[in-house]
């Protein structure tokens, strides 16, 4: 269905579906002012000036062609403006949020169309004032002179500080970034509407591929279909590069070449999510390239990953340690692989501590989602260094801290992914044979699964006051198989 207005599609933990096809004009405006106040609260100050620089127009090296524009996400959080060459200030004491847009340029307007006007900016954002860039320098000097260096100007980085000819300038480049990270990790209603819409469009694109997969012959066709559906529904940008890995490519976590044929392969791992007004979705589905599971091995691995995801999602609620869900996912993976004779029947904790399960499940269970697909937070969600396995350690043992106090808890308003996976990567298995953990792996049996590649299932989950809400609408499991069958029957 082609929609002319954004839609809210919500799949809640009780499996009910709610669809709203219209928004009021006020709902289209960003929540920039609310975000600015939230950041000031996280800073813990009552005065000072926040100064942010938007993404400038930049050409490719040795070229007159501009690089694709992508707004700086911290700037968007406080402005709601997705246009280049803008600036922003927030006077904390005066509670005054001011946006500066590019000056009118007739030549540019003739060639490229006019830049953002003051009136248009007010329609898009709830900032207090909008001025042209020409006023920025004067306003900054006026504020600095007025405060005589007694109040700081907060900037994200040294490279983004204002050029003010003053010897009494007080710049703080340390406190703003962590304050904004702490603010961004909890999403408000405006942000949730954006993330729901991104998921809704992603769901349409995933569904379209399921309907047509029997006609497709290459990974590139899958990618192009996903892009076409997203763009036709107003989502021109993707949250990240599309991953459409078939066969052994499904075992490469960030495979983005998407240039090989599907013929003779069992599964395709499709990791693709649309972006809506700078907010991300992150969705993965593993699709059989047959009317049903192409092999018992493929079905069995899918079922293990399905259980990993369902059990972890079921336990999401405020106050839960995400680290514990990561451990639960590994426990389910180990027991599932033991039943398939891929791992030995030793103690699950010994297998986990050896790193043997990480040969098959080498990444974190999930991450925050928001303005970035791997969104910011005050601390890593699993207390992992970088929220990943230690890739410098060839044993692939995840660095999970044992210090309970340092592990962050899930909180209401967080949006996190639950994305377990099991992979049979030829290089990872070859490397594991030379490690102490090899005693826990039946390599002869594991190698039989290499043609499957890997299985990953990923949804975006909102932590609510009473539990969770699944924001992802893309079909999976039996619903996915039924859509594939109907597509063949209707062709």
UniProtKB/Swiss-Prot annotation:
Q: Respond yes or no to whether keyword Metal-binding is given for this record.
A: yes
Q: How is the cofactor bound?
A: Binds 2 manganese ions per subunit.
What Gene Ontology terms for biological process does this UniProt record contain?
proteolysis
Q: Which CDD domains match?
A: Prolidase
Query: Which residues does Mn(2+) 1 bind?
Result: 282, 419, 458
Which cofactors does this protein require? Mn(2+)
What reaction(s) does this enzyme catalyze?
Answer: Release of any N-terminal amino acid, including proline, that is linked to proline, even from a dipeptide or tripeptide
Specify the enzyme's EC class, one word.
Answer: hydrolase
Alphabetically, the GO molecular function entries are:
manganese ion binding; metalloaminopeptidase activity
Q: Binding positions for Mn(2+) 2?
A: 271, 282, 458
Record key words, sorted: Aminopeptidase, Hydrolase, Manganese, Metal-binding, Metalloprotease, Protease
Whether Hydrolase counts among this entry's keywords is: yes
Which EC numbers characterise this protein's activity in its record?
3.4.11.9
Known function: Catalyzes the removal of a penultimate prolyl residue from the N-termini of peptides.
Q: Which family does it belong to?
A: Belongs to the peptidase M24B family.
What is the protein name for this chain?
Probable Xaa-Pro aminopeptidase AFLA_084750
